Amino acid sequence: MMGRVNSQLLRVVQDRSVANGEKLQRLYKLISATGSKTATATTTATTTTTATATGGGRVLALDSHVHRWFNTHVRGSKFYSHYHFLIKHGVHLAHATRFFNKLLTGSEVEFQLATFQIFLINEENQQVFFEKFHRLYTFDMMLQIFDRLIARRDFRYVKFYLAALTRKMSELATDRTRTVQDAELMYIKFNNSLLYYLLMEGNVPMFLRTFKNEVEYIKSSTLQNSDSAEVQQALLKPVHLFVQMLRKNNSPDLIFELLPALQTKSRSKVFNAYLTSTVASTIRTFNDPTLMLKFLLTTAKGTKFPELLNELGLWRYIVHGEPGKIDPKSLQEDRDKFEKANSVSALKAMKRVDVVLLTELYRVFLSYSSSVMSPDKFRHCCIDLYSHYVQFCEQNKHKLRGWKFDTGVLNVILYHIRYRLRDDKLAYEVLVDFYGRESMVQSVKNTAKKCPFSMVIYDNGTVTTQQLHALLQLMQRYNVPLSFQICYTMVKRLLQMNEPEQAFEWYTRILESGFDVRHHGLVELVLQQGWSLPHHFNHDLLEDDKLDSIIEEEPTEECAELVEDVKELMQSV
């Protein structure tokens, strides 16, 4: 029957001899006649409008070309009446997304029509919702409506929407054309929306139970190796919602509710690593070194992590608030106390996570210490931790390649010396000392976008010209690539020394290296010297004052590096 109806509708659409207004009326007449043969009308009234809708009956699946014609020729002022007409006559709304999205963001009465709330307000007309909502909308459109209502904190009819979604899933489960992956994705999307509702409602216990169940389901599903962006987004959404829940409730200890789910055997190391790194990044926002230590010990691979932290001088600082190391007996006592207070067994994670999280521990501890210690005590703390770190690295330099030895910890220490302690000279001395240990440095990998040399050289007036050249020679010796910060500093320094030709050579390096010229200080110098900006430079930035300034920002590349690796892996599988 629908094949014949669609043929008639298409003939009307393609008839060039008929004006668009007349076409619209003919299309409506054909749809109305088709719908009236299989449906009965029910009338519902609101204070602003009258909505009439059919009850049961078949769904009319109009040809997509007919919907396209509607998209082009139905005026904005008629969107509401058009959409109401489609609902009234049982037209499937999958291809009416233009009207759907517009009404969702329109007036209150338009929103009520798109969400079918108009049929729920009056109990006498709720049957229309029960019979039509799940039949006229796709599953994803139903979820979109549900999420939009939750975002508005409109929980009045949650049970109706959840019942409709459950009914839709049950019907789709019997569709033999759908794959196992389709069913898994549908279930995960539904749970994501349910988590969002529990988050917004503030039901933490139910949120945690639902979250753990979903993570365990994901780990046993066949979707983890999918390269679909839609699938990846669905898989990672529960983690984002969990992070939102932690921050909303300001309850960092709840993060350990996640650990049992992390311990579940996963088909995908990528997904497991993403969970671990996301939790670590979240913990950092609470700026609590004890909390980070607790999490790091639960995610550590092997049993020697407390010993490592003791060798690095971190354990005594975090646990006892004092510098130095403690004896093995005291360390074991501390460890026993920790295990007794925290009954969480070790987690399995990617091998490199240990180093990434170690860098995070340094970052959190130094950030916290800079706010509670006096400047003199914090200075001693930075020097003490650096000394223990390089001593450990030199003693274990033959093992460092397997340990993924990089510049993460050094960057964190240098950052806090320069921008928290405000001691540029000490930062220079630490950098020179580190790269003066030749046998150790040969094992170092510069994995961060902002290398240690950039951290020290950028806008550092205490570094003399002679010292600057010595640092550049060190970079060349160890194949450390030039960064924008270093090139900009050289341009600025040489212009101050009245060496415009050499300064221009460094500016040329910036252009040849492909660095994006958006820095306010550099653009100002270029304009002052009459040099040419790159041909692709957006001159609107000058008028809108949208140029960048390289500010004092903590280097987060080491933790972000793992997340980027995860994304790349997920895209490549």
Swiss-Prot record:
It comes from the Eukaryota. Coiled coil: none annotated. InterPro entries: Atp22 (IPR017207). Keywords: Membrane, Mitochondrion, Mitochondrion inner membrane, Transit peptide, Translation regulation. GO terms for molecular function: translation regulator activity. It is found in: Mitochondrion inner membrane. Its main location: mitochondrion. Signal peptide: none annotated. It is a peripheral membrane protein. One of its GO terms (cellular component) is mitochondrial inner membrane. GO terms for biological process: mitochondrial ATP synthesis coupled electron transport; positive regulation of mitochondrial translation; proton-transporting two-sector ATPase complex assembly. The keyword Oxidoreductase does not apply. Belongs to the ATP22 family. Translation factor specific for subunit 6 of the mitochondrial ATPase. Required for assembly of the CF(0) component of the ATPase. This is Mitochondrial translation factor ATP22. It comes from Candida glabrata (strain ATCC 2001 / BCRC 20586 / JCM 3761 / NBRC 0622 / NRRL Y-65 / CBS 138) (Yeast). The lineage of its organism: Eukaryota, Fungi, Dikarya, Ascomycota, Saccharomycotina.
